[in-house]
Amino acid sequence: MKRSSQDSGSRSIPEDRKLYVVDSINDLNKLNLCPAGSQQLFPLEEKLQDISTDSGNGSRSLFLVGLIIVLIISLALVSFVIFLIVQTENKMEDVSRRLAAEGKDIDDLKKINSIIVKRLNQLDSEQS
């Protein structure tokens, strides 16, 4: 009696494994990962290898796209900085021209002031 219980226990484990394998194959067939009618796992392994190599190429292409985007953005920023430098230079030239013109005006005003002061001094000396 003891033997029959041990035998039935040892036989139930392989049967459970067989059921598990059959259920797994059925699940694969439902997911269309395994070709219809075949129960070999080699095509699945080939598909997994194809997926892994495609993901490597995808990451490379994603990296290249990201690199190109970063280069375009940096080129745009450099162009913008150059544009700002040119605009600042133009503004500085305008300011320096205005200062030079105002400096000439100030010199003219000083000359006129000195002429007026001389004339006033002459008038004061004539009156005294």
Swiss-Prot record:
CC terms in the record's Gene Ontology section: membrane
Pfam families documented for this protein: DUF4577 (PF15145)
Modified residues (Phosphoserine): S24
Sorted UniProt keywords: Coiled coil, Membrane, Phosphoprotein, Transmembrane, Transmembrane helix
InterPro entries: DUF4577
Transmembrane residue ranges: 65-85
Chief location bin: membrane
Name used for this protein in its record: Leucine-rich single-pass membrane protein 1
Organism of origin: Bos taurus
Primary gene name: LSMEM1
